[in-house]
Amino acid sequence: LKKLISKYHITLISLGNGTASRESEQVIVELLKEIPVKVQYIIVNEAGASVYSSSKLATEEFPQFDVGQRSAASMARRLQDPLAELVKIDPKSIGVGQYQHDMNQKKLSEALGGVVEDCVNRVGVDLNTASASLLEYISGISKAVAKNIVAYREENGRFEARNQLLKVAKLGPKAYEQCAGFLRINDGKNPLDATGVHPESYAAAKTLLERLGYTTEDVKERRLDGISKKISNYKKLAEELGVGEITLQDIVKELEKPARDPRENMPKPILRSDVLEMKDLKPGMILKGTVRNVIDFGAFVDIG
């Protein structure tokens, strides 16, 4: 492990919270005391990792790895981009409470799938890096179309504009209308493609920028922070631009902070370098925790 840390300049270790997690944590802590460079670790929820590691998708992604190695790779990816990795498994595999197996499984699957879809669309997806597993949760994109997008990207190179999606097999105008606003293109031909502004609203967005003394280049350089303060009457301006008031508010939010990630407002993960034990806990301490399970007599909260 020391050799791997030195060879690949490791600075952060992802440690699963499953079987022998505590023992593994102790080994890592002792190891970190012996090396000169600063390396930290974080406990990652490994629910569903075994399901992924034995799946067809995992075999396709890591044909040269065994099941254990695939699980390890998944743990590391969950730390890098949890949303992109967790979409690869059935949400039921994560564990959603004591009574999940007593429910109507069809309705449960539909509800959980809807939540995942809402999360993916709310965050948005980078069109040039997203896997087919992630793309298929975007509104208007089926599994087949998601694979076609990846195939088009591999054959023709990166997407430079959103409207290139219309060249993808089986992705028609209606599907494009549904998905375009949730797909981002960084460093593309049009800076608006990197925002959540829908192509249907591009004309209104450009007119708005001109009125406020800006250009799309200012969007690219992120020089539009605070433009909402320059608008005194949203209703009147929306009528002049030919869009709804709520649509205008959404456009302004996107222009102010393009490619903003709603997850940025969530508590940051705790990076650690030593083990937290029961004896370290004192009355009155305030700790951050994750609810792992809710049962009839209470809840299990993981505080590390």
Annotated model-derived regions:
Residues L12, S54-V67, V96-Q100, D118-V120, ...:
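Short beta-alpha connecting loops at secondary-structure transitions
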Residues R122-N265, R272, F300-D302:
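Accessory alpha-helical DNA-binding modules that contact the DNA backbone or grooves
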Residues L1-G113:
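Phosphate- and other anionic-substrate recognition elements at nucleic-acid/protein interfaces
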Residues R263-M285:
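Short boundary/loop segments of OB/S1/cold-shock single-stranded nucleic-acid-binding domains
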Residues A20-S24, A49-Y52, R158, N186, ...:
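Flexible loop/turn segments at secondary-structure boundaries
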Residues D81-Y152:
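Charge-patterned, long linear interaction tracts outside catalytic cores
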Residues L4-T11, G16, E30-K38, A47, ...:
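Conserved, well-folded catalytic cores of nucleic-acid-processing
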Residues D280-G304:
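S1/OB-fold single-stranded RNA-binding interface
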